[in-house]
Each structure stands twice: as structure tokens, then as C-alpha cells.
């Protein structure tokens, strides 16, 4: 005898009084559950980077939304392609002439530098070199009180693993070395102390 049970579209009532869900229904439920798990996995992966933090240093979450910041400039260094981005406070300061006018960047100014391994598009006209797999993302933030012992800036470097799609703090073996603080870029950037420790110029556009 065929009856309708709540939660199952069509079932067969067996002599033992059990409701056996049709095979097609089981398959549909299985597919839906698999899709839900995959969706949850993607969501978790997308959120993971915002939980990453350098011990006694910068947290990835301090730069939430950096992917949509305006471009300051692009560069190639050490065989990697990079794009340098700035938050509104950083861009406004550049537009006002900082640091060329001798004034420092304001507290709250932030920069992000995304590095990719280069990839040559051999089938495209001119065989252009374009970004391939991501390598890392580096951050700078101006906070003259918080980072008084490093020129008013805090630095953080986070390496990317394309296999697991996750970020982790760079290590002492990285370039620049990332210790348990926010000074990984300070030694290098002292070369441009007269530019408020910022190498990148705002490209004309």
C-alpha cells in the first residue's frame, strides 16, 4: 500500500510497518546535503583569512575589504607581480600631495600589497605576463601611538597557500622576516624615512 508521510513525497508501507523512502528521494536529499556542505565549506574558506593574526602584530581583519580599495600603483620585484592598494585615508593623503609635500600620512591610512607569481599567456597576442597563483599579501597601517617604536607604522605579511586556499603569517625565514610583532617592514622602509616610510608613489592616471 502506498501512503504519504510528512517529509517524504511518496513511500511504500511495508508489512513491518516501516516507511521506506523511494530511492529517488534519497538521491535528491543526498545531493542537497552535499551542496549544502560544499556551500558551507566555501563560506568557511572565505572567512578564514579574517581570523588570521600575527602574534603581537597585525590581524587580517584590520584590513577587511582591502580587495576593493583603489589602486595606488603596480610593481614587479623579485620575480613577482604586485598591485599596491590604499584605503580612502591613504588615497586622500596622496591626492593632497603626501608625502612629496613633506607632510606625513594620517593615522588610519592603510596599504595592501598583493603578490602573484607571474604567468605567461603564450597563446595571447604578444604573450603577455599576467598574475598567476597568489603568493602573499602584505599590509601597512599608520597608527602613531600604537607603533611609536617603528615610525608610526605597523607591518604584516601573510603567505597564501593555493592548495588549501588559506593564509598564514609569514615567518622569520620570509623576505622580509616576519617576527611576533608588527615590525617586519620597518628596517627596509627606514631608507625612505623622509617619505614617511612609504616607497610607493601614486601613479598618474
Regions found by a protein language model. Name each.
Residues 83-101, 122-125:
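N-terminal post-signal-peptidase region of extra-cytosolic proteins
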Residues 29-40:
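Bacterial N-terminal signal peptides
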Residues 21-25:
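Positively charged n-region of N-terminal signal peptides that target proteins for export
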Residues 39-47:
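Sec/Tat signal peptide C-region and signal peptidase I cleavage site
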Residues 1-20:
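Short, Lys/Arg-enriched N-terminal segments with co-localized hydrophobic residues
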Residues 46-78, 102-205:
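Sequence context surrounding c-type heme c attachment/ligation sites in exported
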Residues 7-9, 26-29:
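Short helix-onset patch at the extreme N-terminus, typifying the N->h transition
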Amino acid at each position: 500500500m502506498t501512503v504519504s508521510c510528512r517529509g517524504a513525497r511518496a513511500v511504500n508501507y511495508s508489512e513491518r510497518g516501516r516507511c521506506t523512502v523511494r530511492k529517488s528521494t534519497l538521491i535528491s536529499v543526498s545531493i542537497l546535503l552535499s551542496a549544502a556542505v560544499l556551500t558551507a565549506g566555501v563560506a568557511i574558506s572565505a572567512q578564514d583569512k579574517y581570523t588570521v593574526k600575527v602574534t603581537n602584530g597585525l590581524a587580517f581583519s584590520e584590513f577587511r575589504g582591502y580587495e576593493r580599495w583603489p589602486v595606488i600603483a603596480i610593481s614587479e620585484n623579485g620575480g613577482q607581480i604586485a598591485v599596491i592598494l590604499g584605503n580612502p585615508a591613504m588615497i586622500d593623503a596622496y591626492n593632497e600631495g603626501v608625502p612629496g609635500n613633506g607632510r606625513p600620512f594620517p593615522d588610519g591610512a592603510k596599504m595592501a600589497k598583493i603578490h602573484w607569481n607571474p604567468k605567461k599567456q603564450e597563446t595571447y597576442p604578444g604573450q603577455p605576463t599576467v598574475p598567476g597563483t597568489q603568493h602573499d599579501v602584505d599590509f601597512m597601517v599608520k597608527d602613531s601611538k600604537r607603533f611609536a617604536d617603528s615610525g608610526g607604522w605597523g607591518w604584516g605579511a601573510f603567505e597564501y597557500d593555493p592548495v588549501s586556499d588559506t593564509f598564514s603569517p609569514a615567518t622569520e625565514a620570509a623576505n622580509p622576516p616576519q617576527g611576533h610583532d608588527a615590525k617586519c617592514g620597518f628596517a627596509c622602509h627606514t631608507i625612505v624615512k623622509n617619505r614617511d616610510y612609504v616607497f610607493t608613489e601614486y601613479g598618474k592616471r
